[in-house]
Amino acid sequence: MYQYQQLAQLLKNEILNGNLQKGDKLPSIRDLVEQYGVNKDTVQRALRSLKEESFIYAVKKSGYYVLKNADVNKEPSLEGDYSQLPIEDLRICFNQSLASAKDLRLSKKEQASGMNELIDALMPVLEEYGVYATKEQLVITTGTQQALYILLQLIQGKKILLEQPTYARMNELVRHLEIPYETITRQIDGGIDLVHLEELFASGEFSLFYTISRFHNPLGGSYSEATKKKIVELASRYSVYIVEDDYMADFVEGNATPLHYYDMDGRVIYVKSFSSILFAALKIGIVVLPKELVEPFAMRKQWMDYDSNVMMQKTFTLFVENGMFDKHRKEMVESYMAKSKHAKRWLLDSGFHDGTLHGTQWVFEHSKQVEQKLKEYNLVPEKLDEYYISKKAPILYRVDLAKIREI
């Protein structure tokens, strides 16, 4: 964490703990420099960060004032934590992109497949995820949803197989595009019934299977390595494409690999966005395609979207090339692992024994006892009905303990 982020967190804690109330004036920049032993630039960046998070506001020729009230008696609550976003680094990269905007002209191929510089920068990143491919197999997209939409248009003729529950927007795409489908249950522990999966593949009715292999959304679990190998083997045997959504690849530690790692026959289409490690507004995704699908995919993308936001592509290129992405990712993984350990401890200390915890994702069946106990902690669980394409979905609930500030 940068020094300005540490200072921002200290000041934020003063607000959250009630030591600074709404309307209170913060110490002057000079006083903060003396109090915390940092330079003026660090203080200004910390204040800018707090302003962007709407904790404080500036009054011209007067100073900075607290914008938010803090309820010191408030129990842990679910709210996004933006303190670790590399806003300043991204701003620097964006300004550099803006300065060179007149030179950002893409070739016809780049308009379809993405900026060459960005693809080159992401090749080693993909290898860290366990994805090995040629440059020609990569296409930059405007986020995951665009990639999924194109794939659903491209691979037609048969039904698609959806794991359930799954990414809500994939359910919406399939429903609104009126694509024929069947479902298979993704188990709460992260696994899947491989016997049933083979029966479905062997029927010859499916062209595509959509799955989230690691850190499943919404359940949180991951396939075992043996399960991944078997799924890829079945896809190869029965000529079914797998669309592997690996949106949380950045948070994987150890030797866990994606399905794509085991694919020797070009059956796995790897889809990755960077919103989970950065923020959704970035709208940059990457797809790794079997060679026979690259040209038709890129052509359809160009029909929809002449070129994915060039400024954002250049900004992200600089962010990766300058080592900022790698540094930020390591910080986020370290933070996530710490929160996972704290989440497990908090769950036990709070007396919750129902459900399953994967990382920070706690999934459980609804009960009045759990609901009542959650109210004591001012927690509102998320009902997972939107993650099912059928209205007759099982009643599962989730709490993302990573978003509890006290964790």
Walk through the language-model features, giving the residues of each:
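N-terminal basic, amphipathic alpha-helical segments
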Residues: M1-E110, A298, Q302-N309, Q313, ...
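Short glycine/serine/threonine/alanine-rich loop segments
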Residues: V38, F55, I179, V240, ...
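Active-site PLP attachment segment
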Residues: K61, D263-P296
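Conserved core of the PLP fold type I
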Residues: R105-Y238, D250-Y262
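Helix-loop "lid/cap" segments that line or gate small-molecule binding pockets
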Residues: L122, I286, Q313-E321
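General small-molecule cofactor/ligand-binding pocket signal
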Residues: V139, P180-I184, I269, G355, ...
